[in-house]
């Protein structure tokens, strides 16, 4: 923290780094303790298993532990190449339990960090549009794989579908992931 402050950094957001989903409440308790001891971070994006019917209760427990929470994140990116895949399948945004839990976020005042590959962006645009009262952040600038045209074209087409959505912001991070 001293090094960052010396370089002019004045605030930081902790974004969950893939703790086990059965430990996400413990994670919030831990990061709140870090904040209590140091004053850092200033905001938190946590995680919860949004495919679990009990995710609402988990998020309520997280919220009770920390006023720093601003949202939640669950990686949905799926790729034909298993090495790039995180989600169990390409259509996770259609899961009824997942969608019900996303529907809880606006009431919590939380955003959802959306991590998808370009091939999922058309689906993501419909998904984001279905939840107009929830803020979404497109993670890693939409997961552009490389600067080769075969990758840039679907990425650009996907961004054109997402760009008009007023409840979506893009995070410039992890470009080229």
Segments and roles (model prediction):
Residues 24-38, 125-137:
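Short, electropositive alpha-helical surface patch
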Residues 12, 31, 44, 62, ...:
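Conserved, mostly hydrophobic/aromatic
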Residues 14, 43-46, 111-115:
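Short catalytic-loop micro-motif centered on adjacent basic/acidic residues
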Residues 51-59:
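Glycine-rich anion/phosphate-binding loops
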Residues 88-177:
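Catalytic pocket-lining loop regions of alpha/beta-barrel enzymes
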Residues 16-19, 74-93:
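Glycine-rich phosphate-binding "P-loop"
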Residues 1-33:
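An N-terminally biased module of ancient metal coordination in phosphate/nucleic-acid-related enzymes
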């Amino acid at each position: 923290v001293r090094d960052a402050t010396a370089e002019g950094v004045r605030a930081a957001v902790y974004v969950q780094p893939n703790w086990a989903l059965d430990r996400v409440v413990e994670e919030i308790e831990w990061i709140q303790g870090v904040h209590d001891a140091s004053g850092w971070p200033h905001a938190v994006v946590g995680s919860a298993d949004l495919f679990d019917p009990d995710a609402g209760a988990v998020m309520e427990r997280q919220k009770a532990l920390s006023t720093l929470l601003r949202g939640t994140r669950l990686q949905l990116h799926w790729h034909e190449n298993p090495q790039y895949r995180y989600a169990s399948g390409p259509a996770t945004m259609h899961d009824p339990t997942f969608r019900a839990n996303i529907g809880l976020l606006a009431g919590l005042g939380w955003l959802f960090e959306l991590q998808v590959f370009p091939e999922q962006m058309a689906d993501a645009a419909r998904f984001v549009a279905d939840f107009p009262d929830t803020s979404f952040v497109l993670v890693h600038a939409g997961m552009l794989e490389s600067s080769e045209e075969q990758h840039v074209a679907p990425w650009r087409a996907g961004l054109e579908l997402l760009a008009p959505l007023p409840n979506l912001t893009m995070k410039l991070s992890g470009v080229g992931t």
